Regions:
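Structural motif
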Residues: 6, 24, 91, 109, ...
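Short, flexible hinge/linker loops that cap or flank conserved catalytic cores
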Residues: 37, 65, 109, 168-169
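FAD/FMN-dependent oxidoreductases across multiple families
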Residues: 125-204
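A secondary-structure boundary/capping signal
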Residues: 14, 118-119, 180
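A structural signal for short hydrophobic beta-strand segments in well-ordered beta-sheet cores
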Residues: 20-21, 97-99, 169
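Conserved FAD-binding catalytic core of PHBH/FMO-like flavoproteins
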Residues: 29, 43-157
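Conserved N-terminal helical subregion
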Residues: 1-56, 62-69
Length: 204
């Protein structure tokens, strides 16, 4: 949790946005929107697919659009998910359930988890607009009924699915990690699986 960072000697500056970047042989200077200028030996860009540091470092990152959207929501299942990830591969794309701790108290709130449902853009919009009961029925059917009924616990949202690879991960004293370096399809959580080696390389 980010709240533990100060105890590890990490200084937090938030909320803040990066506005300027300058670097030379001795170090890098990052200017924030509140006027503060941070100086360091390296700037690690871990600021996501729309990385401001990547843009300021003039590193190109071409985008390939899958013309799909990832529909996400917080849900409760009627049947226990047994603290296991569930995934089904459908003609329209995979649907996955990522479990939260299953304490078995289904009478209180059901068995909680979050879904990521990969869909063509028009189908995703249809399900975003569908009445809640209809969406829940279609979601249950997408999982083959194995988890029983589904009950929405949040609003539905969707994000575009794209592949984006930075042309290089290092520019002088700026290093890209995680989604700032590579954005990929959420299938099987490969985004985080590729981000962790970036962090390991920093420690080497």
């Amino acid at each position: 949790c980010w709240r533990r960072l100060p105890a590890a000697g990490v200084r937090l500056h938030c909320p803040a946005k990066v506005e300027t970047l300058a670097q030379d042989a001795s170090g890098v200077r990052v200017g924030l929107d509140d006027g503060l200028v941070l100086e360091a030996r390296l700037a690690i860009a871990a600021d996501g697919g729309h990385s401001a540091l990547r843009r300021l470092a003039r590193i190109e990152a071409p985008v390939h659009d899958y013309h799909q959207r990832g529909l996400v929501a917080f849900v409760a299942t009627e049947a226990p998910h047994r603290d296991a990830c569930w995934q089904r591969f459908l003609p329209t794309g995979p649907v996955a359930l990522l479990p939260f701790n299953d304490d078995g108290d289904a009478q209180l709130h059901g068995h909680l988890g979050s879904i990521v449902w990969t869909l063509p853009e028009t189908e995703a919009q249809r399900l975003l607009d569908a009445p809640q009961a209809q969406f829940e029925r279609e979601l249950s059917a997408a999982f083959g009924g194995e988890l029983g009924g589904f009950t929405l616990q949040s609003q539905r949202a969707a994000f575009p699915l794209r592949r984006q690879l930075a042309q290089r991960q290092v520019e002088g004293r700026v290093l890209l990690v995680g989604d700032a370096a590579h954005v990929m399809h959420p299938l099987a959580g490969q985004g985080v699986n590729h981000g962790l080696p970036d962090v390991s390389a920093l420690r080497a």
